[in-house]
Protein backbone atom coordinates (compact mmCIF):
# COMPACT_ATOMS: atom_id res chain seq x y z
CA UNK A 1 0.00 0.00 0.00
CA UNK A 2 2.79 2.41 0.95
CA UNK A 3 4.60 1.61 -2.30
CA UNK A 4 1.44 2.39 -4.26
CA UNK A 5 1.01 5.76 -2.49
CA UNK A 6 4.66 6.61 -3.13
CA UNK A 7 4.22 5.75 -6.80
CA UNK A 8 1.15 8.00 -7.07
CA UNK A 9 2.98 10.86 -5.30
CA UNK A 10 5.99 10.56 -7.62
CA UNK A 11 3.73 10.41 -10.68
CA UNK A 12 1.84 13.49 -9.50
CA UNK A 13 5.05 15.45 -8.93
CA UNK A 14 6.38 14.42 -12.33
CA UNK A 15 3.11 15.47 -13.95
CA UNK A 16 3.25 18.84 -12.18
CA UNK A 17 6.81 19.35 -13.40
CA UNK A 18 5.78 18.50 -16.94
CA UNK A 19 2.73 20.75 -16.67
CA UNK A 20 4.91 23.62 -15.46
CA UNK A 21 7.38 23.11 -18.30
CA UNK A 22 4.54 22.97 -20.80
CA UNK A 23 3.08 26.32 -19.68
CA UNK A 24 5.56 28.21 -21.87
CA UNK A 25 4.76 25.88 -24.77
CA UNK A 26 1.08 26.67 -24.22
CA UNK A 27 1.07 30.36 -23.26
CA UNK A 28 4.38 31.97 -24.27
CA UNK A 29 4.48 31.08 -27.96
CA UNK A 30 3.43 34.55 -29.15
CA UNK A 31 5.82 36.50 -26.90
CA UNK A 32 8.75 38.37 -28.45
CA UNK A 33 11.57 36.02 -29.36
CA UNK A 34 14.98 35.83 -27.68
CA UNK A 35 17.62 37.87 -29.49
CA UNK A 36 15.15 40.40 -30.88
CA UNK A 37 15.27 44.08 -29.99
CA UNK A 38 12.88 44.88 -27.14
CA UNK A 39 10.05 47.00 -28.56
CA UNK A 40 10.04 50.61 -27.38
CA UNK A 41 6.42 51.49 -26.63
CA UNK A 42 5.75 55.20 -26.20
CA UNK A 43 2.25 54.99 -24.66
CA UNK A 44 3.15 53.75 -21.17
CA UNK A 45 2.73 56.01 -18.15
CA UNK A 46 3.67 55.63 -14.51
CA UNK A 47 1.02 55.43 -11.83
CA UNK A 48 1.44 59.21 -11.41
CA UNK A 49 0.83 59.82 -15.12
CA UNK A 50 4.44 60.51 -16.13
CA UNK A 51 5.59 59.08 -19.47
CA UNK A 52 7.83 56.02 -19.29
CA UNK A 53 10.49 55.13 -21.83
CA UNK A 54 12.12 51.68 -21.66
CA UNK A 55 15.26 53.07 -23.27
CA UNK A 56 15.86 55.04 -20.04
CA UNK A 57 16.95 51.70 -18.52
CA UNK A 58 19.44 50.85 -21.28
CA UNK A 59 22.66 49.52 -19.80
CA UNK A 60 20.83 47.41 -17.23
CA UNK A 61 19.17 44.01 -17.25
CA UNK A 62 15.41 44.61 -17.08
CA UNK A 63 12.54 42.30 -16.14
CA UNK A 64 9.16 43.30 -17.57
CA UNK A 65 6.30 41.88 -15.51
CA UNK A 66 3.00 41.91 -17.44
CA UNK A 67 0.16 41.56 -14.93
CA UNK A 68 -3.23 42.90 -13.74
CA UNK A 69 -5.02 43.22 -10.42
CA UNK A 70 -8.01 41.24 -11.76
CA UNK A 71 -5.88 38.28 -12.90
CA UNK A 72 -5.93 35.29 -10.48
CA UNK A 73 -2.66 33.83 -11.82
CA UNK A 74 -0.99 37.25 -11.50
CA UNK A 75 -2.08 37.55 -7.88
CA UNK A 76 -0.73 34.06 -7.22
CA UNK A 77 2.60 34.92 -8.92
CA UNK A 78 3.01 38.40 -7.35
CA UNK A 79 4.83 37.26 -4.17
CA UNK A 80 7.37 35.33 -6.27
CA UNK A 81 8.07 38.32 -8.52
CA UNK A 82 8.38 40.60 -5.47
CA UNK A 83 10.96 38.15 -4.04
CA UNK A 84 12.87 38.21 -7.33
CA UNK A 85 12.90 42.01 -7.17
CA UNK A 86 14.09 42.01 -3.56
CA UNK A 87 16.87 39.56 -4.44
CA UNK A 88 18.12 40.96 -7.75
CA UNK A 89 17.38 44.69 -7.70
CA UNK A 90 20.22 45.29 -5.21
CA UNK A 91 22.46 43.59 -7.80
CA UNK A 92 21.46 46.09 -10.49
CA UNK A 93 18.52 44.35 -12.16
CA UNK A 94 15.61 46.70 -12.89
CA UNK A 95 11.99 45.54 -12.74
CA UNK A 96 9.05 47.20 -14.48
CA UNK A 97 5.49 46.09 -13.82
CA UNK A 98 3.28 46.60 -16.85
CA UNK A 99 -0.31 46.55 -15.67
CA UNK A 100 -3.21 45.57 -17.89
CA UNK A 101 -5.63 47.27 -15.51
CA UNK A 102 -8.16 49.84 -16.71
CA UNK A 103 -8.99 51.07 -13.21
CA UNK A 104 -6.19 53.05 -11.55
CA UNK A 105 -7.62 52.56 -8.04
CA UNK A 106 -7.72 48.75 -8.40
CA UNK A 107 -4.16 48.92 -9.73
CA UNK A 108 -2.96 51.01 -6.77
CA UNK A 109 -4.74 48.73 -4.30
CA UNK A 110 -3.05 45.61 -5.74
CA UNK A 111 0.37 47.29 -5.64
CA UNK A 112 -0.13 48.05 -1.94
CA UNK A 113 -1.65 44.64 -1.17
CA UNK A 114 1.29 42.71 -2.64
CA UNK A 115 4.02 45.10 -1.46
CA UNK A 116 5.19 45.78 -5.00
CA UNK A 117 8.02 48.30 -4.79
CA UNK A 118 9.28 48.32 -8.36
CA UNK A 119 8.27 50.78 -11.07
CA UNK A 120 4.73 50.35 -12.36
CA UNK A 121 3.44 51.53 -15.73
CA UNK A 122 0.26 51.07 -17.74
CA UNK A 123 -1.80 52.33 -20.64
CA UNK A 124 -5.00 51.94 -18.58
CA UNK A 125 -6.69 50.26 -21.54
CA UNK A 126 -8.25 46.85 -21.99
CA UNK A 127 -5.56 44.18 -22.16
CA UNK A 128 -5.92 43.26 -25.84
CA UNK A 129 -6.13 46.93 -26.87
CA UNK A 130 -2.80 48.00 -25.39
CA UNK A 131 0.10 48.89 -27.66
CA UNK A 132 2.49 47.17 -25.26
CA UNK A 133 0.67 43.81 -25.32
CA UNK A 134 0.60 43.93 -29.12
CA UNK A 135 4.28 44.91 -29.37
CA UNK A 136 5.45 42.16 -27.00
CA UNK A 137 3.00 39.50 -28.21
CA UNK A 138 1.40 39.18 -24.78
CA UNK A 139 -1.75 37.06 -25.00
CA UNK A 140 -1.57 35.64 -21.46
CA UNK A 141 -0.77 37.13 -18.09
CA UNK A 142 1.26 36.89 -16.08
CA UNK A 143 4.04 37.05 -18.64
CA UNK A 144 7.62 38.09 -18.03
CA UNK A 145 10.27 39.28 -20.45
CA UNK A 146 13.93 39.63 -19.48
CA UNK A 147 15.90 42.16 -21.51
CA UNK A 148 19.69 42.46 -21.53
CA UNK A 149 21.70 45.65 -21.04
CA UNK A 150 21.80 46.20 -24.82
CA UNK A 151 18.01 46.08 -25.17
CA UNK A 152 17.78 42.55 -26.57
CA UNK A 153 15.23 40.02 -25.36
CA UNK A 154 16.89 37.25 -23.35
CA UNK A 155 13.87 35.33 -22.06
CA UNK A 156 10.14 35.49 -22.75
CA UNK A 157 8.19 33.28 -20.32
CA UNK A 158 5.09 32.84 -18.19
CA UNK A 159 7.13 31.15 -15.44
CA UNK A 160 8.73 33.31 -12.75
CA UNK A 161 10.99 30.43 -11.71
CA UNK A 162 12.68 30.57 -15.15
CA UNK A 163 13.35 34.27 -14.59
CA UNK A 164 14.88 33.46 -11.20
CA UNK A 165 17.21 30.87 -12.71
CA UNK A 166 18.33 33.25 -15.46
CA UNK A 167 18.91 36.14 -13.05
CA UNK A 168 20.92 33.86 -10.78
CA UNK A 169 23.13 32.92 -13.74
CA UNK A 170 23.52 36.53 -14.90
CA UNK A 171 24.37 37.94 -11.49
CA UNK A 172 26.78 35.17 -10.48
CA UNK A 173 29.16 35.93 -13.37
What are these regions (language model features)?
Residues 1-19, 173:
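Bacterial Sec-dependent N-terminal signal peptides
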Residues 42-62:
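A short beta-strand-turn-helix
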Residues 58, 66-83:
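Conserved redox-active cysteine motifs that mediate thiol-disulfide chemistry
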Residues 58-60, 90, 116, 138:
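Active-site acidic short loop of glycosyltransferases
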Residues 116, 124-170:
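Thiol/disulfide oxidoreductase modules built on the thioredoxin-like
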Amino acid sequence: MLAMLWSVAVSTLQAQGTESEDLDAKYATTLVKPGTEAPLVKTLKTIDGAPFQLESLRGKVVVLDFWASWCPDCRKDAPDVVKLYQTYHPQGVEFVGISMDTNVEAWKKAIAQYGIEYLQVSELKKFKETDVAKAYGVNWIPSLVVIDADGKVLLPTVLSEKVGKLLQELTSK
